[in-house]
């Protein structure tokens, strides 16, 4: 079986071997050391400020999306959400659920966010900006510098879902003044699904500390407090966190986040060159290195999916 899906992706032999091992007890100094190292490397690879923190949630990326919305935003905010597909819609649904005032920038499928579209919302009193930097459902990667400039100009709190693009595309929390970054274990981190990761700036931590959401499992204040001792409030996905540790250390020993991004970019470019003479059209205005969104011109996506799966042992996303 070969995964050519956006996630889960192919894991290394080293990561898979850890999955075969007996899961150890975790309320120990040894596991705390692993978590401290995970936090250090995540902050390094996200290019976060020295006073930023990392939270590891046992749950999918959506769990961390929900945790961020409920812990950093309130009914006193006025939020602007980029909605370019199903994951942008997820943020809309979360703000609706928690009764957080919002407006959405609704984009056509495959279309990138443009500066003139943003300009309509300039100076309109928005306090926070929420975006999936890579809208995985359509394969569109948004211009983070443009978004960052807009948020700086309007003094907006910036939340970025980088679940499918972290490590695949350039990302710089400090340079782009990002307050919250979210990612997941099963995308370019190339580990099994089950853990999502939140990187919080000092400004975001301040919001978390002032907020009192009605939740237990996704309470980031509790998660940050426990993280000070290298632990989590509740039983975490111990095995996956050990796999993440091995993967992060491997990225560091191979030259760091820049080398990893270059490698993934080269793979994306090679595939796109090879596919261009086949009967497909690319439906994204601006692609991430993580995904090549193709529309088949001579067959159904589901038929291609089934043929690759059943006859070749290759998995792709049929949607």
Where are these regions (language model features)?
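Glycine-rich phosphate-binding segment of PLP-dependent enzymes
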Residues: 5-48
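Conserved beta-loop-alpha segment that forms the PLP phosphate-binding cup at the N-terminus of a helix
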Residues: 51-84, 88-91
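Conserved C-terminal alpha-helix-loop-beta "cap" of PLP-dependent enzymes
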Residues: 90, 276-319
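Conserved active-site segment immediately N-terminal to the catalytic lysine
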Residues: 174-186
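Active-site C-terminal subdomain of aminotransferase-like
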Residues: 10-11, 186-269
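Active-site phosphate-binding strand-loop segment of PLP-dependent enzymes
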Residues: 112-167
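Hydrophobic beta-strand scaffold residues
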Residues: 102, 158-159, 282, 316
């Amino acid at each position: 079986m070969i995964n050519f899906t956006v996630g889960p992706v192919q894991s290394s032999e080293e990561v898979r071997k850890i999955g075969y091992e007996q899961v150890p007890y975790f309320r120990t100094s040894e596991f705390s050391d692993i978590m401290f190292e995970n936090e250090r490397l995540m902050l390094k690879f996200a290019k976060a400020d020295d006073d930023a923190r990392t939270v590891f949630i046992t749950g999918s990326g959506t769990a961390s999306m929900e945790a961020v919305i409920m812990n950093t935003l309130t009914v006193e905010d006025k939020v602007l959400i980029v909605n370019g597909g199903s994951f942008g819609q997820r943020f809309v649904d979360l703000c609706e659920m928690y009764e957080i005032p919002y407006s959405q920038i609704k984009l056509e499928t495959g279309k990138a966010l443009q500066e003139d579209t943003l300009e309509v919302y300039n100076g309109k009193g928005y306090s926070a900006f929420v975006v999936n930097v890579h809208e995985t459902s359509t394969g569109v990667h948004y211009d983070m510098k443009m978004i960052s400039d807009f948020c700086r100009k309007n003094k907006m709190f910036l939340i970025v879902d980088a679940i499918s693009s972290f490590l695949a595309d350039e990302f710089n929390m400090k340079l782009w003044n990002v307050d919250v970054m979210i990612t997941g274990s099963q995308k370019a981190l190339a580990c099994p699904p089950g853990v999502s990761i939140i990187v919080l700036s000092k400004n975001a931590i301040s919001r978390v500390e002032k907020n009192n959401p009605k939740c237990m499992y996704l309470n980031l204040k509790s998660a940050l407090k426990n993280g000070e001792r290298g632990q989590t409030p509740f039983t975490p996905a111990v095995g996956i966190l050990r796999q993440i540790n091995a993967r992060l250390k491997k990225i560091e020993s191979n030259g760091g986040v820049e080398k990893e991004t270059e490698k993934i970019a080269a793979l994306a470019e090679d595939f796109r060159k090879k596919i261009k003479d086949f009967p497909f059209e690319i439906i994204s205005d601006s692609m991430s290195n993580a995904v090549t969104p193709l529309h088949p011109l001579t067959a159904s996506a589901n038929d291609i999916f089934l043929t690759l799966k059943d006859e070749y042992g290759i998995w792709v996303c049929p949607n």
